[in-house]
Amino acid sequence: MIYNSIYEMVNDIDPPKLPVIVPTHNNPAYLKMMLGQLDKYGLDDVIIIDNFSLYPEMRALLKEISDKYIVVSKFTNEGPREFYTNPLLFNWLPQKFIVTDPDIGFNPNLPSNLIEILEKVSEDFNLFKVGFALDIEFDGNESIKKIMPWGKTIYDWELAMYLNQIGETSSGDPIYKAPLDTTFCFVNKAYDNGDFLYTSTARVGGNFIGQHYGWYENPPIPEEEKEYLINNAGRWSSTSNGGNSG
């Protein structure tokens, strides 16, 4: 099913019990990768919110997968936080759901009951969002050691995310109180305090540490797609829209 707006979708269907929101913009290889990872964990109630992609390969993919997934193909780019900033969408979603950027690689040791674990962390610590910590020691991480517009490197910023451990999961993975944007996260509306990024969020390390391929100099996507992303500078990014956390 393809919708042309959030309004059209919310007025036509009820939300799935545990939807997975995947915001996209001209990144078909990442979306295919993410859908494969989600399928492996039985997370198939996916809602793809596409932010006005014009890349032909992306348009073709959205059409191809619309028989299996809900696709909202919008004519505007509101960025990956629209699930929160758009009251119509946020109020339509159930109390608990998942959000993930498409360029996140799952840890090969990620447990099969990851949602159960993240939900328990949310309930135990009264957290709005609980998600993956991010790997900053990957090969070629010089790409995140450059000074960014806010005066720090991504590496230094992310290193600070590992300083405040508040507990462990039942399987011994450390839980860190840290800012969290739209990397893979479990969302619990019961603990929304109006602060999207900072005060009601945590990251889980250990076997939950994921790869953020958007940081890579040579990400696992076709060269043509990489060039398209580089040459279309209008793309939304957290670093230019009020945040710099994963």
Where do the PLM segments sit?
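Conserved short acidic donor-positioning loop in nucleotide-sugar-dependent glycosyltransferases
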Residues: 26, 38, 51-53
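Active-site-proximal specificity loops/subdomain of glycosyltransferases
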Residues: 56-97
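Short beta-strand-to-loop acidic/aromatic patch adjacent to the donor-nucleotide binding site
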Residues: 94-109
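N-proximal low-complexity "stem/linker" segments adjacent to membrane-targeting elements
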Residues: 1-36
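Short, acidic, metal-binding catalytic loop of nucleotide-sugar glycosyltransferases
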Residues: 36-45
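Conserved donor-nucleotide/metal-binding helix-loop-beta segment in metal-dependent transferases, i.e.
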Residues: 110-129
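C-terminal catalytic/acceptor-binding lobe
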Residues: 2-4, 151-246
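Short beta-strand-to-loop element that shapes/binds the nucleotide-sugar donor at the catalytic cleft/hinge
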Residues: 130-145
